[in-house]
Amino acid sequence: MIKCTRRIEFDAGHRIIEHQNKCQFLHGHRYVLEIAIAANKTDKLGMVIDFGLIKDLAKKWIDENFDHSLILHQDDKEMGQQIENCTGQKIYYMQNNPTAENIATHLKNEIFPKLFVSQNFFVTSLKLYETPNCFVEV
């Protein structure tokens, strides 16, 4: 198996419902996402994937949905709608609390399989950095 990794950076805000500390409040991060893609063999050009294709598919989705958005739990829709109405802020709703763990799992299991559906490779893992020192891997 041969693996290639592409980094994508984006800025987004979120909050964790029922968190007992400061993460219960709206705040933001400079997220760094590392997408690891693998194949059993390279293509006729000697590549697993053209890094530009990862950018075209994954970064485009991130830019349209997550970058400079507010990522909220679907139970936060009332607050999200008020923020969107007042500021025009882009809101992305998740079924779970938008923790780094849940965001990475959502991308790996629900979003990226749809983006890369007709390709000869697969996403093996994602690393999502919430800060330079803290990340999750799924």
Swiss-Prot record:
EC supergroup of this enzyme: lyase
Source organism superkingdom: Bacteria
EC nos: 4.1.2.50
Any single GO BP term: queuosine biosynthetic process
Molecular function GO labels: 6-carboxytetrahydropterin synthase activity; metal ion binding
Cofactor(s), by name: Zn(2+)
UniProt KW keywords: Lyase, Metal-binding, Queuosine biosynthesis, Zinc
Cofactor binding note: Binds 1 zinc ion per subunit.
Gene3D superfamilies in the record: 6-pyruvoyl tetrahydropterin synthase/QueD
Residues noted as binding Zn(2+) in the record, renumbered to the chain: 14, 27, 29
Residues at the catalytic site: 23, 68, 130
Reaction catalyzed: 7,8-dihydroneopterin 3'-triphosphate + H2O = 6-carboxy-5,6,7,8-tetrahydropterin + triphosphate + acetaldehyde + 2 H(+)
Matches recorded under InterPro entries: 6-PTP_synth/QueD (IPR007115), 6-PTP_synth/QueD_sf (IPR038418)
Pathway stated in the Swiss-Prot or TrEMBL entry: Purine metabolism; 7-cyano-7-deazaguanine biosynthesis
Record function comment: Catalyzes the conversion of 7,8-dihydroneopterin triphosphate (H2NTP) to 6-carboxy-5,6,7,8-tetrahydropterin (CPH4) and acetaldehyde.
Family label: Belongs to the PTPS family. QueD subfamily.
Further information: The active site is at the interface between 2 subunits. The proton acceptor Cys is on one subunit, and the charge relay system is on the other subunit.
Protein name: 6-carboxy-5,6,7,8-tetrahydropterin synthase
Lineage: Bacteria, Pseudomonadati, Pseudomonadota, Alphaproteobacteria, Rickettsiales
This protein's encoding gene: queD
